[in-house]
Each structure stands twice: as structure tokens, then as C-alpha cells.
Amino acid sequence: MEGIGQKKETDYIFDKTIKCDVCGKEFKTKQVRTGKARFIGTDDILKPLYEGIDTCKYDIIMCPHCGYAASLRLFGHHTEKQRQAVRDNVSSRFTAKEPETETYSYERAVKRCKMAMLTEMVTGGKISESAYLCLKLAWIYRGEIQEAKANGAAQERISMYEKYEKEYLEDAYRGFKQARETEYPPIAGMDENTITYLLTSIGIHCGKIDEARRYGYALLISRTASMKLKNKTRDVLETIKKN
């Protein structure tokens, strides 16, 4: 039973009407109210943490009519050639219909993020953008793990989510590593120091200890990295010693 004054997830979100650039139809998508949820910080893989809501479930916009999907930052910013690629390769076969619900479940968030990955694939998006979507999927699965544990789910189910989280972290690691070598910052909206930090932290999760150390030490001696990021780097490097 919820306490008096305790906010529900629905208090943090609203329905926004959007016109799809691919099919031209209008639809409603749930988005987080700006400034409504209190920002707590980020975890070791930079998942944003808010009080009362996991905003990662609402990071993807997907048209329910044609299947076009992308992150909040990229939705509606594809070229006509890319939009046509979505029509030819996604919309022509899209049949999934989302039910009306008050909030988005983690399962639904996963499906939406995978549709965004499909959009990236058919539009020839940058490697970094695909890597960022893999990271988002890892964030979503991390949230699903926490929810499953809180609800007393079977260990088998929790282990399955943990497996998926690691798989997408591995994909994100490979993508960001390649993007760092082939793209100019900003990379997926992030500066080089942030990417280097992610390679340090994600590398540790993926067992790439030597590579993670190299990235981490390079960040610690960087003249452009913030003290906050350096302290976060020290924290994740410390986990190597503990383990």
C-alpha cells in the first residue's frame, strides 16, 4: 500500500503527441516530465538514476504505425534517404502493436530499444549510435534485474537478465572501442573522456582488465578530464583490486 504523498511512476510521465517523419501519422508516446524526478546520479556504467522512476524505460520513441524508432536525441533527425530505408525494410513488415498501458514495463522498453537498433541498422547509422543503444539495453536489463530481485523472482530469471546485460555490455564495448578509433567527438553525444571512462568501466565488466586499466590510467593523467570523472574512474579501477 502506498504511503500518503508517495508518488507513483505515472506522476513522472505524460503522453506527448508526435508526428512520425516516416509514415506521417500522429501517435502518442510516454515521456518523462522535465524536472519532475529528482536526479540522484549515475552508476558505474553511467546509467542515469532518478528517484521514483527508471527513466531509461522512456528513452526510445517508436511509431506504433510503421515501426520507426530512435532515441529521444535522434528521433525525427534522419534524412529522407534513411526514412525511405525504414519504409522499405521495417515498415513494410511491421505488424507489432503495443497495448495501451499507464507505464512502460521493462519488457516493453527492451522491445522498443531493439526496434531502434533495427532502425540504426537499416539507415546505416554510426557505430557509436549502435553501441549507445546496446548500452541503453544493458541499462534496461540492469533495471529489470533490480525489479526482479525486489519482486522475489526466481534466480533462473534473474540469471537470464544478467546474461543479457553482459551480452549487450560486450556489444557496447566493441562498438565504443571502434568508434573511439574511427569517429571524431562528440561520439553518440559524448566527449572523448566520457567514452574512455565507459571503456574502462564496461571493460572491467567484460573481463578486459588490461585494456580497462590502460583506458583508466590514460584518463587519470588527462588534463581535460574533470575531477569528478577521475574520481569515478578511480572507483571502478579499485574494483579490479578487490576482485
Can you say where each PLM-predicted feature lies in the sequence?
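N-terminal cysteine/histidine-rich coordination modules
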Residues: M1-D88
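Structural signature of alpha-solenoid helical repeat junctions
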Residues: E129, Y164, Y168-D171, Y184-E192, ...
